[in-house]
Amino acid sequence: RCAAFALDCFTAWSRGLDEQSTPEGNPLPPRRVVTLRLRAEQRRAIVIGDVHGCAAELQALLAKCGYERGRDVIVCAGDVVNKGPSSVDVVRFLRAEGAFAVRGNHEEAALAFATGAGDARSKLIAEQWSWTAELSRDDLAWLTALPFAIALPQHNAIVVHAGLVPGVALEDQLLKDLVSMRGLVPRPCS
């Protein structure tokens, strides 16, 4: 009985249902899943993954795609920040463009470090996350509002950062899978 209760508590924690926070301790976004329907004047949804703070490369990629503001919609599949030299510039560019994005594990870590959620500051390397001090309130609000999935019904597609478990309804997926799944094959017992 205790084991079943513990499993229920772990499942709720993994889904981010305890106290309305994610497993990292960040607040949940207003909506876990956003449905994006392209308007008549919008011709494409350009889906880009793992920008990792590389603003120049993002702009070059969009130019190569023939991106047209107002006609195309940018959809980022998480990890828009960290590792590269200009995470704050990437966030501000995406905000200015009205881009959509899902929250990946690097957004989760950045939010936790910037806000001191959970015990992130003791776990994370300060130099790797020092750029978060440059984020404005609006930048943090944008990152916090990122959903964990974006449905694109016109394309019969769902954008997540990491993965979806086959056979599990989108609303029942665990946050840890949407944000940081590494594979579908169960690991053998050691």
Language model regions located:
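N-terminal active-site segment of His-dependent metallophosphoesterases
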Residues: 2-92, 97
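Active-site neighborhood of divalent metal-dependent phosphoester bond hydrolases
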Residues: 87-190
